[in-house]
């Protein structure tokens, strides 16, 4: 049987400008979790926008992947929700996402309904990534 690893995915790219980075980060993190690994997904900087409903639900408007239908947006959203529901850990940079008017008081209005969010800072970024065997950065 395969050895379990700790994976750390760091998304800082703006999903509206680099949708491929956002989608690949989600699909790779989901796959690592499905294969039985421990997986942390840390969104920071412009990457925090991936959790915004209006952004993830409209990825298909900024990428040719998925043929321009909303299927690719739905796949990304569902993958992230499933990732969260099945034990994937999601961190969001609290300072970064505040730039977009989202905070711990109003996030339920703005973000997709992931099971749990860790509101984090550079301290947690370093602590969590230092536990990883493998780091992906998008």
Language model regions located:
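Short internal beta-strands
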Residues: 39-45, 90-94
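A glycine-rich helix N-cap at a beta->alpha junction
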Residues: 59-95
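N-terminal beta-loop-helix "entrance" segment that forms/cooperates
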Residues: 47-60
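Extreme N-terminal starter segment of soluble prokaryotic enzymes
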Residues: 3-8
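A short aromatic-anchored loop/beta-hairpin motif
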Residues: 79, 83-87, 91, 98-129
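Short, basic, glycine/proline-bearing loop/turn elements
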Residues: 11-15, 60-68, 106-112
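Histidine-anchored nucleotide/phosphate-binding helix
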Residues: 21-35, 41
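Short, glycine-rich nucleotide/cofactor-binding loops
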Residues: 9-22, 45, 51
């Amino acid at each position: 049987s395969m050895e379990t690893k700790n994976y750390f995915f760091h998304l800082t790219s703006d999903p509206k400008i680099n949708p491929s980075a956002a989608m690949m980060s989600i699909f790779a993190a989901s796959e690592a979790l499905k294969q039985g690994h421990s997986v942390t997904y840390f969104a920071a900087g412009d990457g925090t926008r991936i959790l915004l409903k209006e952004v993830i639900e409209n990825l298909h408007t900024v990428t040719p992947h998925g043929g321009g239908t909303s299927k690719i947006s739905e796949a990304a959203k569902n993958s992230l929700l499933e990732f969260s529901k099945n034990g994937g850990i999601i961190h969001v940079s609290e300072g970064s996402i505040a730039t977009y008017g989202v905070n711990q008081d109003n996030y339920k209005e703005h973000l997709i309904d992931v099971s749990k969010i860790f509101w984090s800072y550079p301290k947690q970024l370093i602590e969590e990534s230092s536990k990883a065997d493998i780091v992906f950065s998008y």
